[in-house]
Curated annotation (Swiss-Prot):
The chain crosses the membrane at residues 12-32. InterPro entries: ATP_synth_B-like_membr_sf, ATP_synth_b/b'su_bac/chlpt, ATP_synth_F0_bsu_bac, ATP_synthase_B_chain. The keyword Ribonucleoprotein does not apply. F(1)F(0) ATP synthase produces ATP from ADP in the presence of a proton or sodium gradient. F-type ATPases consist of two structural domains, F(1) containing the extramembraneous catalytic core and F(0) containing the membrane proton channel, linked together by a central stalk and a peripheral stalk. During catalysis, ATP synthesis in the catalytic domain of F(1) is coupled via a rotary mechanism of the central stalk subunits to proton translocation. The keyword Transmembrane helix applies. SUPFAM superfamilies: F1F0 ATP synthase subunit B, membrane domain. It comes from Pseudomonas syringae pv. syringae (strain B728a). This is ATP synthase subunit b. Belongs to the ATPase B chain family. The gene is atpF. Signal peptide: none annotated.
Length: 156
């Protein structure tokens, strides 16, 4: 192989091309690579933060769900207690009302019984006077013997 001027010229041109590339082409390429590398690193950091935020959000949502379930269970328990209380109050009110109605009925029965007893006493007194009249064959003055009849009726 002969080293001639063409080879030297090509070597010089190649060397100038390499210098030109190092001076003008290489820095923007390196800058683009560094920028891309930075964007990728930022994207990875953002993805990591997003994953962490997602995990925290899921944890918070789970906690809120547990709190909501506990609160719902508490509300249900309070509703059950209130329902039981209402039923007990209704029972007590019904019992009091039944006792009142029973006492009122008892008083009415007592009144009716006393009225019937008084009516029977009066009838018994009249029957006794009529019976005595028939037995004695004479008329007995009712006004004169009213006190006697009332005593007799009271004893009965």
């Amino acid at each position: 192989m002969n080293i001639n001027a063409t080879l030297i010229g090509q070597s010089v041109a190649f060397f100038i091309f390499v210098l030109f590339c190092m001076k003008f082409v290489w820095p923007p390429v390196i800058a683009a690579l560094h920028e891309r590398q930075k964007k990728i690193a930022d994207g990875l950091d953002a993805a990591s933060r997003a994953a962490r935020d997602l995990e925290l959000a899921q944890e918070k949502a789970g906690q809120q769900l547990r709190e909501a379930k506990a609160q719902a269970a508490e509300i249900i328990e309070q509703a059950k207690k209130r329902g039981t209380q209402i039923v007990d109050e209704a029972r007590e009110t019904a019992r009091v009302e039944a006792d009142r109605v029973k006492a009122q009925a008892q008083a009415e029965i007592e009144q009716e019984l006393n009225g019937v007893k008084d009516a029977l006493r009066a009838q018994l007194g009249s029957l006794a006077v009529n019976g005595a009249e028939k037995i004695l064959g004479a008329t007995i003055d009712q006004n004169a013997h009213a006190e006697l009849v009332n005593k007799l009726a009271a004893e009965i």
